[in-house]
């Protein structure tokens, strides 16, 4: 999927995260993470984000994550929502999101 414009998903409430995704003109995936639990779970959060982007075939994006202790399922859902908003997806391919 090609990121067409910046998009947000999520909140800054406890146990949630906010995802901002935008086109990366330099190419590739650039991930910026700010998390209250980065010391313990930063690597795992990055893995979930990168795996979700890969599953959605996103190759070029600047992704900024502000995490407040979100579970993996929340991270995955917020990243998926941000990608779909940034790509203006009208017909969702649900099998791609499992």
UniProtKB/Swiss-Prot annotation:
<keyword id="KW-0963">Cytoplasm</keyword>
<comment type="subunit">
    <text>Oligomer with a subunit composition of (alpha,beta,gamma)6.</text>
</comment>
<comment type="similarity">
    <text>Belongs to the CitD family.</text>
</comment>
<dbReference type="InterPro" id="IPR006495">
    <property type="entry name" value="CitD"/>
</dbReference>
<dbReference type="GO" id="GO:0005737">
    <property type="term" value="C:cytoplasm"/>
</dbReference>
<feature type="modified residue" description="O-(phosphoribosyl dephospho-coenzyme A)serine">
    <location>
        <position position="14"/>
    </location>
</feature>
<comment type="function">
    <text>Covalent carrier of the coenzyme of citrate lyase.</text>
</comment>
<dbReference type="InterPro" id="IPR023439">
    <property type="entry name" value="Mal_deCO2ase/Cit_lyase_ACP"/>
</dbReference>
<keyword id="KW-0597">Phosphoprotein</keyword>
<protein>
    <recommendedName>
        <fullName>Citrate lyase acyl carrier protein</fullName>
    </recommendedName>
</protein>
<dbReference type="Pfam" id="PF06857">
    <property type="entry name" value="ACP"/>
</dbReference>
